[in-house]
Amino acid sequence: MSVPGPYQAATGPSSAPSAPPSYEETVAVNSYYPTPPAPMPGPTTGLVTGPDGKGMNPPSYYTQPAPIPNNNPITVQTVYVQHPITFLDRPIQMCCPSCNKMIVSQLSYNAGALTWLSCGSLCLLGCIAGCCFIPFCVDALQDVDHYCPNCRALLGTYKRL
């Protein structure tokens, strides 16, 4: 019997497989495909048992969305805030607002309300022979002016009364 055309009849055992490939052969052939990632667990809202066996609600966590990029330039303005300075009866170290240098203030004592009140009180007690002027010699009874030693600007005043 002759076979028509260029084909010839196969001789010997049949080349077609008689059974499908085994599972191991199939997995080995398809091993170059990546496996899909495991699904991530979502936020839990149920009760979770704590270490003491009691149920407790876990806190919910939410992520903030990523900021949208903006091509506009951002301008930054620096603001310097100078706190109010409390003047006392002793020199203070500060930056002079007039000459902008770090200084230690110079003190000047002037008669204030407490000085005059002390003088009047001593007059009422009978210290008329010049003793009533003693408060004008005591620095602890007078107001204090703070001056800059560089530019002689008045920085502030401490009033005793």
Curated annotation (Swiss-Prot):
Sorted UniProt keywords: Cell membrane, Charcot-Marie-Tooth disease, Cytoplasm, Disease variant, DNA-binding, Endosome, Golgi apparatus, Lysosome, Membrane, Metal-binding, Neurodegeneration, Neuropathy, Nucleus, Phosphoprotein, Transcription, Transcription regulation, Zinc
Name used for this protein in its record: Lipopolysaccharide-induced tumor necrosis factor-alpha factor
Gene encoding the protein: LITAF
Residues of the LITAF domain: 76-160
GO cellular-component term (any): cytoplasmic side of early endosome membrane
PTMs per UniProt: Phosphorylated on tyrosine residues in response to EGF.
Membrane-binding amphipathic helix: region residues: 111-134
Residues that coordinate or bind Zn(2+): C96, C99, C148, C151
Organism, as annotated: Homo sapiens (Human)
